[in-house]
Amino acid sequence: LSTRRQRQMCIRDRDELGNFDPNTRIIEYMIDEKNRNLSNKSLVDFANITSSESPAPGGGSISAYCGALGASLAVMVSNLSAHKRGWDDKWEYFSKIGEKGMLIQSKLIDLVDEDTDAFNSIMQAYSMPKNSDEEKKIRDLNIQAATKNAIEIPYEIMKVCFDSLEIIKKMAIKGNPNSITDVGVAMHCVKAAINLSLIHI
């Protein structure tokens, strides 16, 4: 079973979803009404929100963040390489790689929030009324649409992470040799994000 499905099963009484209100049930909404984006939280707040009783953020958001950290390390190595003494002729090469890496990092950070939003949409779809056949039909259609969107998020995380592997490979071959351990950590972060995203599909 996917992590998302396990979350749903953890709610023992499905009728409980009928009263699902993200403003009162999603912990980060309760903590900060004006600043809901996970990407704007501090590291400590993000960790505390993740460890709370709220089912979101969950594995999908963590996968995206793991990939973002890997991409960030790759960008760091490109910056260190671009400014390495004696490598002035390589500045443009590493700068272009760094720019691409920043775009990847930004996209993965966005996916942290998109995954949590997708899960919240599923919960809201389940909370729709089902008193008549028409309401049940509309509810089912919304559940299907929300679930499809939720599945597409980990696909996107994997796609973006594969792009970052190209950058990491270049840093391993041509980057500052003093940063090779950082390149290794970047690679493992991104590979972990890919494998973790696969779990959610």
Residue ranges and their predicted role:
Residues S52-V75, S179-L196:
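Conserved phosphate/anionic-ligand binding catalytic regions in large, soluble enzymes, centered on
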Residues N37-P57:
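Short, hydrophobic/aliphatic alpha-helical segments
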Residues R85-M128:
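A structural-propensity feature for long, helix-poor, extended segments
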Residues Q8, R12-K41:
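Long, contiguous binding/interaction regions
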Residues L1-R7, I11, H200:
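Single conserved hydrophobic/aromatic residue that forms the stacking wall/gate
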